[in-house]
Regions:
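Conserved catalytic-core motifs of GNAT/GCN5-like acyltransferases
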Residues: 116-118, 133-148
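A short beta-loop-alpha structural element at the N-terminal edge
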Residues: 4-19
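A short helix-loop-beta-strand connector motif used in the catalytic cores of GNAT acetyltransferases and
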Residues: 45-61, 80
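Conserved acetyl-CoA-binding loop-helix of GNAT-fold acetyltransferases
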Residues: 92-105
Length: 153
């Protein structure tokens, strides 16, 4: 099992976190998306957009190994996971689960009753393993494919 450390994202680490998101998205999710979907994903998942959201209602945590960011999770309003990415070479080592568990604990601590996610097709089985339930069939909005899901806490 890999040893990793989870910490709240610091602004000086945002560019590295964005790189993890970009690399993982392009490898595993972009092949299922239209050109429009890829463009719209990057309208959301870019430095300026995420920095602005961090100043409002979004929080992010990163997993680091020897100081290198290998995983990222983001959530907003203490109730909606909007990013969860782990670099390919570090997947299947418990990093996504550890990031997820931290967010769930944070949500429980503020009395959140339900957490939602719009899961990509690639991550759908991961969220099912985490105990999420599909709210609907796969949907596509602005070229972005997702499964709306929720989990009662």
């Amino acid at each position: 099992m890999l040893e990793f450390k989870i910490e709240e994202l610091k602004l000086e680490d945002l560019k590295e976190a964005i790189k993890v998101i970009e690399d993982t998205f392009l490898k595993f999710e972009a092949p299922d998306y239209s050109k429009e979907g890829i463009e719209n994903f990057f309208k959301f998942a870019n430095y300026e957009s995420i920095r602005e959201k961090l100043n409002k209602n979004m929080k992010m945590y990163v997993a680091k190994i020897s100081g290198k960011i290998v995983g990222v999770i983001g959530y907003r309003d203490n109730s909606h996971i909007n990013l969860l990415f782990v670099l390919e070479e570090y997947q299947h080592n418990g990093i996504a689960k550890a990031l997820y568990n931290l967010v769930i604990e944070n949500c429980k601590n503020v009395a959140t009753k339900k957490v939602t996610v719009n899961s990509s097709p690639y991550a759908h089985n991961v969220y099912l393993k985490f105990g999420f339930i599909d709210d609907n069939q796969m949907q596509e909005v602005d070229g972005i494919k997702f499964y709306p899901m929720h989990k009662e806490l």
